[in-house]
From Swiss-Prot:
Keywords: Calcium, Disulfide bond, EGF-like domain, Glycoprotein, Nucleus, Signal
Location of region: Disordered: 520-547
Signal peptide: 1-19
Paired cysteines (S-S): C186-C197, C193-C206, C208-C221
Protein name: Oncoprotein-induced transcript 3 protein
Example GO molecular function: calcium ion binding
SUPFAM superfamilies, per the entry: EGF/Laminin (SSF57196), Growth factor receptor domain (SSF57184)
InterPro entries: EGF-like_Ca-bd_dom (IPR001881), EGF-like_dom (IPR000742), EGF_Ca-bd_CS (IPR018097), Growth_fac_rcpt_cys_sf (IPR009030), ZP-C (IPR055355), ZP-C_dom (IPR042235), ZP_chr (IPR048290), ZP_dom (IPR001507)
PROSITE patterns named among the record's database cross-references: ASX_HYDROXYL, EGF_CA, ZP_2
Compartments in which it is found: Nucleus envelope
Function, as annotated: May be involved in hepatocellular function and development.
């Protein structure tokens, strides 16, 4: 009877020699555009809003008419040459602090931090700052610069010899001992606010979450008891009931997860993103995406916009444990500016940020069986989806023609060609097959497992990995085998795939083969806070092992 032969592990160690890092205080890119300054207010009649889509993880310094440094207070929307200006939500570091991380926030629609990301900041010996800025996940976002006041007249004591400048209330003296920077009151005890503290220029304010309002002290929050108080916190309709109140949305809109805000439904699929907007909400407006050639099509009741991860100016980025695809629906009046057809006050336009989130980590399972259903991973939801991966069984080592309707019955010592295939080819992303294992049943938690790949390393030296032009695709060849026992005539494959950004040298994908000293007791289990896994089950692989 054929037996399962366990082969020796092959450990491949790749040593990288990192180039010597340059000091960002002397190796930076200057941002000197005048429209970046906080004093520059965006005017719709003079052009389109700008977007920092060329900023991509380098070190930058604000110079010239752009300003001295990033503002550390909330900037109103429609400033810095764009709709959503980005400011630094935290104080600048001292020179001795080295490189620190700070949150950067984009202001829009009355929310000082509607979108946020993490940037790095360093104080340089010349009295200036440099910033490592990430590319915004959506447009229209611009990193702002600001001119801070120079304190060269007001001094403590004698101004002869060693003078010490003083700054106005709400500001602090910078490291150059001349510039007055805004003081971030929110960094100390949250500004005394019970919930949200928003730093403003030379001041701050307290805010409350959805369904809550500030008390008269301006610092503590209390629950909204019903629709009579600020419409119950509802963005649209508030209905009173015997047990309390509830928010409702107009026809065609859906209630968001906060149960107070109505929003346009977004359908995130594996290969398409669809936005469906009720026509009566956008009457007189022409809708288009970041790439203005992608426009909405009306079906009589709704205006629908269909696009993919690679089209219409969609920005794809890796954020923590998710792949985030973003775009912006813009609606402009078909009439002349300022006409009664405008439905958005102040901007005379409709702006709908569209975001789909896809988990980075997948577990996909497959086997060989006639009439195999090999559908791509796919979930339809308002704002979440599954990045389109599928596990394919190929006919040969060219990995060009997969089996579709029927799969052959394989014999021992035949070669099995399989691959992890993306159905959408997106630049800037790469994948890592963290693990592949076989089981005699379709259960992923089957006790009997045989690892082909583990911790990103090939565990069986009979396995061959092929290179691919697509950084998201992975191809493998393995000799056909079966599990010990006459009843085990089937084999199922399960692979766990992780998606990363190609430019992130510290990502798990960049580490490649990475054997852990001690494996956790439940390797295939997922921590509740970790990346989510999705399952695609097929199979089984039928083995003809009779001679």
């Amino acid at each position: 009877m054929p037996q399962l032969l366990l082969l020796a592990c092959l450990l491949i160690i790749v040593t990288r020699v990192a180039p010597r890092a340059l000091d960002p205080c002397s190796a930076y890119i200057s941002l000197n555009e005048p429209w970046r300054n906080t004093e520059h207010q965006f005017d719709e009649s003079r052009g389109s809003p700008l977007c920092d889509n060329s900023v991509d993880g380098e070190w930058y310094r604000f110079t010239g008419m752009a300003g001295d440094a990033m503002p550390t207070f909330c900037i109103p929307e429609n400033h810095c040459g764009t709709h959503a200006p980005v400011w630094l939500n935290g104080s600048h570091p001292l020179e001795g602090d080295g490189i620190v991380q700070r949150q950067a926030c984009a202001s829009f629609n009355g929310n000082c931090c509607l979108w946020n990301t993490t940037v790095e900041v360093k104080s340089c010996p010349g009295g200036y700052y440099v910033y490592r800025l990430t590319k915004p996940s959506v447009c229209f976002h611009v990193y702002c610069g600001h001119f801070y006041d120079i304190c060269d007249d007001d001094c403590h004591g004698s101004c002869l010899g060693t003078s010490e400048c003083t700054c106005a209330p709400g500001t602090v003296l910078g490291p150059d001992r001349q510039t007055c920077f805004d003081e971030n009151e929110c960094e100390q005890n949250n500004g005394g606010c019970s919930e949200i503290c928003v730093n403003l220029k030379n001041s701050y304010r307290c805010e409350c979450g959805i369904g809550r309002v500030l008390r008269s002290d301006g610092k503590t929050c209390e629950d909204i008891e019903g629709c009579h108080n600020n419409n119950g916190g509802c963005s649209h309709s508030c209905l009173t009931s015997e047990t309390g109140y509830q928010c409702e949305c107009p026809r065609g809109l859906v209630l968001s997860e906060d149960n107070h805000t109505c929003q346009v439904p977004v359908f995130c699929k594996s290969n398409t993103i669809e936005v469906s907007i009720p026509r009566d909400l956008v009457g007189g407006l022409e809708l288009f995406l970041t790439n203005t050639s992608c426009r909405g099509v009306s079906n009589g009741t709704h205006v629908n916009i269909l696009f993919s991860l690679k089209t219409c100016g969609t920005v794809v980025d890796v954020v923590n444990d998710k792949i985030v695809a973003s775009n912006l629906v813009t609606g402009l009046p078909k009439q002349t500016p300022g006409s009664s057809g405008d439905i958005i006050i102040r901007t005379s336009k409709l702006l709908i940020p569209v975001t789909c989130e896809f988990p980075r980590l997948y577990t996909i399972s497959e086997g060989y069986v006639p009439n195999l259903r090999n559908t791509p991973l796919e979930i339809m939801s308002r704002s979440h989806g599954i990045f389109p991966f599928t596990l394919e069984i190929f006919k040969d080592h060219e990995f060009e023609e997969p089996y579709r309707e029927a799969l052959p019955t394989l014999k021992l010592r035949d070669s099995l060609y399989f691959g992890i295939e993306p159905l959408v080819h997106v630049n800037g992303l790469e994948s890592l097959v963290e693990s592949c294992f076989a089981t005699p049943t379709s259960k992923i938690d089957e006790i009997m497992k045989y690892y082909i790949i583990q911790d990103g390393c090939v565990s069986d030296d009979s396995v061959k990995q092929y290179t691919s032009r697509d950084h998201l695709a992975k191809h493998f060849q393995v000799p056909v085998f079966k599990f010990v026992g006459k009843d085990h005539k089937e084999v199922f494959l399960h692979c766990r795939v992780l998606v990363c950004g190609m430019l992130d040298e510290r990502s798990r994908c960049a580490q490649g083969c990475h054997r852990r000293v001690r494996r956790e007791a439940s390797t295939e289990g997922e921590d509740a806070s970790g990346p989510r896994s999705q399952m695609l089950t097929g199979g089984p692989i039928s083995i003809d092992w009779e001679d």
